[in-house]
Amino acid sequence: MALAYDGAIQRLIDSFASLPGIGPKGAQRIAFYLLQAPDAESQRLVDAINEVKEKVRFCEVCGNVCESSPCTICSDPRRDHGTICVVEEPKDVMSIERTREYRGLYQVLGGAINPMANVGPSDLNIAQLLNRLHDGEVKEIIVALNPNIEGEATTTYLSRLLAPLDIKVTRLASGLPVGGDLEYADEITLSRALEGRREV
């Protein structure tokens, strides 16, 4: 039987361990760091979490995170409103923005098709994307999903769904490792993938 700490400290460790990318040892280190940290530092963390939960929402247009909807990207008249880059998560928007190469809009799907996790097309923000295509302003959709099985399945689904529309559908060029995440790609690799995109 595994040993556990008493009460509050174990609940804190378990809470951190439930977060993505944090294992039991990392959760324990964070919990004990906070236990020994000055009260002001611990309170800053609590305040930051509360502020995010209170103020941050998803953009009604693209699904990106924002404090006011529509987000700053969707409401920027200097952006190219004729191009939409489709990504899985808000963190992917930031990865592409860091390249300073892309000036269009985004659509955050909120994930990718994954039958093993019971995630189908209706669980994603695909309807939100389709609603944006009715006015004829959008001329190109860039599919920038992670190069893994789920990303490929979603790309195939989107390309078939969008085929009847008079919209160019492209995807990022190779250069991103298969099974990798956009989040971890460097700016140069992403810039080259954007520049070399090809039709689906």
Curated annotation (Swiss-Prot):
InterPro entries documented for this protein: DNA_Rcmb_RecR (IPR000093), Rcmb_RecR (IPR023627), Rcmb_RecR_Znf (IPR015967), TOPRIM_dom (IPR006171), TOPRIM_RecR (IPR034137)
Origin species: Bifidobacterium animalis subsp. lactis (strain AD011)
Gene3D superfamilies: 3.30.60.80, 3.40.1360.10, 6.10.250.240, RecR Domain 1
CDD domains: TOPRIM_recR
Protein name: Recombination protein RecR
One annotated GO molecular function: zinc ion binding
Keywords: DNA damage, DNA recombination, DNA repair, Metal-binding, Zinc, Zinc-finger
Family: Belongs to the RecR family.
One annotated GO biological process: DNA recombination
Species classification: Bacteria, Bacillati, Actinomycetota, Actinomycetes, Bifidobacteriales
PANTHER family, alphabetized: RECOMBINATION PROTEIN RECR
One matching Pfam family: RecR_C
Domain of life: Bacteria
Zinc fingers (C4-type) by residue: 59-74
Described purpose of this protein according to its UniProt entry: May play a role in DNA repair. It seems to be involved in an RecBC-independent recombinational process of DNA repair. It may act with RecF and RecO.
Transcription listed as a keyword: no
Domain Toprim per the UniProt entry, residue ranges: 82-177
